[in-house]
Amino acid sequence: MQPRNAQLIWPNGKPRSETFDDIYFNEHDNTAETEHVFIKGNNLPARLDTGLFKHHFLSVGETGFGTGTNLFCLLALIDRCHKQATQRLYFLSTELFPLTHADLEHALTSFPAFAAYTQQLLDQYPPAIKGMHRFILNNGRCYLTLCLGDATQSFEQLSPQHNRVDAWFLDGFAPAKNPAMWSPDLFAAISRLSHTNEELALATHFSTFTIAGTVRRGLQQEGFLVERATGHGTKRDMQKGYFVEHSTLPFNTEHPWVNDVPQPTPKPPRLPTPWFTLPSPAKAPKHVVIIGAGLAGCTTAEALARRGVRVTLLEQGDEICQQASGNRQGALYAKLPVDPTLSGELHLTGLEYTLRLLKIHRLLDGKRADQCGLLQLATSEKEAQRQQQLLANNALSQAVVKAVTAEEASRIANTAIPHSGLFFPRAGWVYPKALCEALIDHPLITLTTHAKVTELNLRPCPTGTTTDAQRWQIISHQGELTADAVVVANAHDAKTLTPLSQLPLKPIRGQVSSAPVAPQASDNDQETTSDTKHSLNTIICGDGYCCPTVENNLYFGATFDLHKVTDEVRPEDHDYNLNTLSKMAPKLAESLPPTTQWHAKVGFRCATPDYMPIAGPAPDFDAYVSRYNKLRNDRKWPFEESPAPLQPSLYLSMGHGSKGLITAPLCAEYLACLITGEPLPIHKPMSDALHPARFIIKDLIRNKIGR
């Protein structure tokens, strides 16, 4: 279900839902109710003191994010009572009707005491884009995962093993006004993500403002012990409790009405997919080696270092970002499919995550990055029809994308555009090397250049150590290293390493042209040259792309060649890029100097057969083929749900193609959480779609792997 912005009215200057005729917070004591119902209702002050914060993170789940009040109150408690703690807070919330940025900013003026938190939320707040949005708050001490969409569907897509919850804030509009949310399916989904513990403080707790019988019975049916408690203010009662068991409770003979609770909607049986197993959450490694210092490697290094993990970054060249990440400007945008897909969701949520990193590191300065928007032009009738279908099928807000005429496109671009198209106002461009330099400027990250890796071997730990685990031995031109875990992020060069030789990666040659342009005229200049007259204000994209001028150069391209492997600049590729630019912006193309004055950058994109990135645990190829061999003859063979044969503590991030700026950072956050055993920023269908073993399974089903 696609999220839609909330429709609000503002009695007394406070937000109220026009759709549900209900308030977002108590206008008289807007934080006291949260502290009573949710903070104290989950017994969090005592639980944090007596053991919950002994672990390296606390996970809280919420229904109904609203204005974020509950999160702010919890952050205030932690900052007040546990300011020196190194543990992190993971706050998982859902919202089907998110406030617009303007409405949220208005609503948050009611919380001046939380200004330090509210500004961070506003800086990172996305439009109404379906999916999981990961926020980095308080310098990485808090991670908000905001699922925009239906609460039940959002929770059902999460892995209980990797997204378990310690405390539930069951909030939202009252059951009488929003019965669709408070359903048996919601309670079943909440139960899946809950856990028991012999030490009561460590078991999953819950609290809620409502005393509705449907809520009480629904939670009891799903394994929660429920009790009434004193409510806040004029509300006499509330409910709270803790998780007891995953199986449904036995028939209650003393109170038989408890058994009349509606049952969750039966789900169609799902074929087991044990081959998409993820490693069980484990203790964070002390030292991780990352092979490759492009976008994938540097973003992963930062995500791990932010969590206190020491990282050694190995680069075979003499500096970072020399290969596909080496362009001066890379377009930061999502080219969406006609129908909603996992690929489209990854691109949209990935774009928003990259924007958060750019803002946190203050890179949106017009030199290292710029959120200037992007025009995707309909340069053919077929593309025009595709764009119309996209708008009709995706129901995205105009804050994400809107249709524009040729005249509107020309005004936005500041040059003549002969095509209609789509305008993506949140898109922009990034200098990948500048982004990577900012990310790896961290005391826990060590960069080693001229370190081409030649061997990657799994070795037993030395005799006398306290663990029986194995460690990775990495041999490079700079010597030998050992590590608790390894992330391979060196694109198609990964195939040169023995454990990864079967990866289906393909290099795609691309040449980006750069043409010198005259410096832009200042506001005081009397004359406007043809160059400044057609200076781009936004990125234009059709069969190629062109970015606004930076450092008196116009960067545009790029060729797409699956067959040529030369890294030499080819004059005919300049001609191709000029022809492509002429179709998109003829006046701009005419203003450029001859191609003999141009320069170029040749790189090789690393792509996969399905053009989705590879991100996740590395499979043991031979063991996979052996274990799942029956898929050759029966794709529905009922395999046991046992862990898949993975390479221990070996992870991959590659195959990002031309979309690395929007996929590599989010994949890095995913890998960092997977490696450290922390809650994941993506749901199970997405991690399945990124899983490195997916091609082995597809080829077995097609019987394309030799016996």
Regions found by a protein language model. Give the residues of each.
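Helix-loop-beta segment of a Rossmann-like dinucleotide-binding subdomain
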Residues: 115, 338-339, 365-376, 400, ...
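Short beta-strand to alpha-helix junction loop
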Residues: 207, 339-350, 377-384, 421-438, ...
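C-terminal catalytic lobe of FAD-dependent flavoproteins
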Residues: 426, 591-707
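A short glycine-rich, Lys/Arg-flanked "PGG" loop and its adjoining helix->strand segment in the class I
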Residues: 183-202
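Active-site substrate-recognition segment that forms the wall
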Residues: 256-283, 289-291, 295-307, 316, ...
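The AdoMet/dcAdoMet-binding core of the Class I SAM-like
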Residues: 51-163, 184
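Helical element adjacent to the flavin cofactor pocket in flavoenzyme catalytic cores
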Residues: 422-461, 468-477, 481, 485, ...
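Dinucleotide-binding Rossmann-like beta1-alpha1 core, especially the glycine-rich loop
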Residues: 329-412
